[in-house]
Amino acid sequence: GDTHAGPSNLRYGFDNWIYGTVGYSRFNGEVNGKKHNFGMGVFRFKPDGSDIEFLHQFNNNTWGVGFNEAGDVFGSTANNNPTFFGGLPATVYGKERGKSAKMIASSPRFYPITPNIRQVDAFNAYTAGCGHAFATSSGFPKNWRNRRAFICGPTGNLLGMYDIQGKDSGYEAVNAFSFVASADEWFSPIVAEVGPDGNLWMADWYNFIIQHNPTPNKGRAGYDAKNGRGNAHINPNRDRQHGRIYRIIYQNHNSKAPKLGNTPQLVRALSHDNLFWRQTAQRLLVDNKRTDAIDALKTLTTKSGHGAIHALWTLKGLNALDQKTHAAALINPSAELRRNALRALDTGKPDATMLYDSANLADKDLQVRLVAFSKLASLPESDDHKKTASLLMQQPENAKDEWLRAALQATGAAELNIVGYKRGPNLLPNASFEEVGDNQLPANWTIRTYSRRNPDLNHAVETRKEFVKSGKNSLRISADTRHDSSLFARVRLKAGRKYVMSGWVRTENLEGTGNGALLGVHELQHAAKTKGVKKTSNWVKVETEFKNEQERE
């Protein structure tokens, strides 16, 4: 059968839920009276089976999920997408579909050391990709720790690597080539994980045929094969009896397993250098309801190491994470702890208040900000949350970042009605024309005329009080015949930002069928211009609001 299609990779999560992946076979069932139907991605369920959630949608069969030491979720797929980042839980979109994961690999290629490989698609790239374990112990070089991810490529007879690096609010993955590769055509790594000893353990399926399709026929393979019950073609070369397990040892590694016999030992193990033992200690404390650890756990959350993260989630699992401890974690110097403290917030009013009070919605660390935005999107829908998201969307740093923007859109960020909010600084140079240049025109302003330049067209600084709205000067453009003329100044506009342009206009005997006197952004034409003032009019304020979609000047 196609093992990529079904559920796999079950593991204990930072949040005390069980995580796993599933392929195209999907899950279509009911849990605690609620129906679910999902496939090809990452899901989680409570250990007691009372709830299940689909979190990250990938684009094909999924057979790999892994966590870095901050609890961020990554995964791999079978076909040409070896590393995904789960930037947002799919739950923030409600019943709608939105981006919850993205392939971050710089290249899906892999690098065999033999030409004798068998692939049916995605040639010379990961197809049948498996696993996504990080180097999360001292059993690896320091510059690999929490960065290097291992993805198996059995159709290339290799175990590959990617270097996972932070990028804006998310991550990128740089192809780091092969960690293990073989010329043995049966060598087929299908999973690699960091073991209890801190070393990398690798399972070799040791099989000549990896992929289930296509089915051979006489014209292509010399014989007509038949498909079995799992839709894979029947072949005597499929081996069901042999396999090998390798352990790859870093020579400078000397970490020892912790003692877990009593509560103090379990609390100490939350700070062990191997993520395996940190999660194991957390699970044992929660499953065995070790409430005698609560005081020590609260003390540990005030630290900034990895132990603080697991202490936080242990308290959460014991229903002992009080507001004081939680609020302190939200402002801890450790960005990784702040991220997890945000994830641990519930969606009720007290926790929503903590979210707003923490200032994490404006956190300098964009990855922290993403989790804060994600939590905002998870709160019950309200006008206040939508207004907050709309305000946050006006910040270019948020609007330009794909994950931050997606989270705010999921919250309901809308075009901001700027009336009633404090506006930013005036970006126009010499906006009141108070400074006059050597050419007797407003400094930093230039004439632009598209009509024929007749002698009757005149641009000047007006100083007579009856023709000045405020200050000492105004700009006067006059002519006896029709013209298309203006003065302009250069202003840099940022992408994803909303702008307001306003001013005061007075006209005398402005006739004709043209647009009249107005303000506008030439490059945006009708999308950014005020209404025109015609005929004879006393001072009237004109204003327009517009959204700029790309950087321009």
Spell out what each predicted region is.
Residues 250-255, 423-427:
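Short domain-boundary/entry signatures in modular proteins, especially
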Residues 169, 277, 289-292, 304, ...:
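Generic signature of intrinsically disordered, low-complexity, basic-rich segments
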Residues 1-254, 262-267, 275, 282, ...:
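Beta-propeller blade termini and top-face loops
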Residues 256-260, 466-467:
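Short boundary motifs at domain starts and secondary-structure transition points
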Residues 272:
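Cofactor-/ligand-binding subdomain signature composed of acidic, glycine-rich
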Residues 420-553:
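Extracellular and organelle-lumenal recognition/adhesion modules and their flexible linkers in secreted
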